[in-house]
Amino acid sequence: MGLWIDATAGVAGDMLLGALIDAGAELEKIQQVVEAVIPGDVLLRAEEVVRQGQRGIKLHVEAQHEHHHHRHLSTIKELLVNADIPEQTKQDALGVFELIAIAEGKVHGIDPEKIHFHEVGAWDSIADIVGVCEAIRQLNPGLIAASPIALGFGRIKAAHGDIPVPVPAVAELVKGWPTQTGALMESTEPVGELATPTGVALIRHFATQDGPFPGGIINEVGIGAGTKDTAGRPNVVRAVLFSTSGKAASNPDTRTLVQLEANVDDQDPRLWTGVIESLLVAGAVDAWLTPILMKKGRPAHTVSALVDSSAVEAVKTALFASTTTFGIRSWEVEREGLDRRFEQVEVDGHTINIKIGSRNGHDISAQPEFEDIRSAAVALGISEREVVARIPQGTTE
């Protein structure tokens, strides 16, 4: 299954989340994940609205009490790392915040780790980012593509005063991605800001292909509505779930990625765990370490990462910063995976998600999600091995 995001009328985090919920992601589970990151802070509420004749879902992120809207990247990372949420959701959210921090750091000329988030550090933006990451984990598309992004034009008031559209952080985030002004037909009036840093960062983190709808069999169309009902065009984002035909349909999870590698023989071995984590946070799809023997019999390691093209520079920066290497090799690879879906089983009142992999319509593999196993083990006061043993027979065969 593929996902195409239509951002030709702009994109914001809450609009994209509304579209994904309309396409089939479960709001209740998303609320649980957001609650685990920022407990008691926000309530998510989906409302069906109409924008210039187009129905859609307006996702409301409602504060439960007063909040401090300014947070450093380190604080947000701590919230995510300590949260008991699916690992994929956690790593994707960390990656999105890292992209925004890198863009903001470049704009303000400071280290991304020292970035003091304003609007993006607010509770609603954290909920948007975590919510979208969880929604995409639930829908589990093998391919994610997106249209050119409508940016808008004119000037807006922000935390740093009156600034032009696109705002500086958005201008950094869209580098290398097709854009358009989003001007209304038969009008030259400024339309203001159509794309927010949160919305753009989510597309840049997830989408590996740009352009119009890739074609295929459309299964679901989710519509996410913005707050304003502006004249002349529906203020919406579309999330289109589709199946491809022919060879790709038998296994849609085939992606072209970039593999980065470096040989390192003088790294403190205690630092390797942090190296792998930094690569994943920077946007790597996967990262690993391989022991090797170099010339003159020197023991060393090869550190490797699989990366979407949009995250190559960020991951290279993280690799240089976290290791002693002076060079990185890179080349394109094609990764083929199984078509995936999730089913649920109960173990002593605790839900365990089972990831099932299939190819050409035949189930090949079924494995329980480890985060669910760990949560159940803690709640029941038993070992993770015992939880696995209690899963109904045949579920993981």
Swiss-Prot record:
Superkingdom of origin organism: Bacteria
UniProtKB keywords: Lyase, Nickel
Catalytic activity: Ni(II)-pyridinium-3,5-bisthiocarboxylate mononucleotide = pyridinium-3,5-bisthiocarboxylate mononucleotide + Ni(2+)
Known EC number: 4.99.1.12
Coiled-coil intervals: none
UniProt-recorded Gene Ontology molecular function terms: lyase activity; nickel cation binding
GO biological process: protein maturation
Keyword Amino-acid biosynthesis appears in the UniProt entry: no
Gene3D superfamilies xrefs: mk0293 like domain, Transcriptional regulatory protein pf0864 domain like
Function recorded in the entry: Involved in the biosynthesis of a nickel-pincer cofactor ((SCS)Ni(II) pincer complex). Binds Ni(2+), and functions in nickel delivery to pyridinium-3,5-bisthiocarboxylic acid mononucleotide (P2TMN), to form the mature cofactor. Is thus probably required for the activation of nickel-pincer cofactor-dependent enzymes.
Family of this protein: Belongs to the LarC family.
Name of the molecule in the record: Pyridinium-3,5-bisthiocarboxylic acid mononucleotide nickel insertion protein
Organism: Corynebacterium glutamicum (strain R)
The gene coding this protein: larC
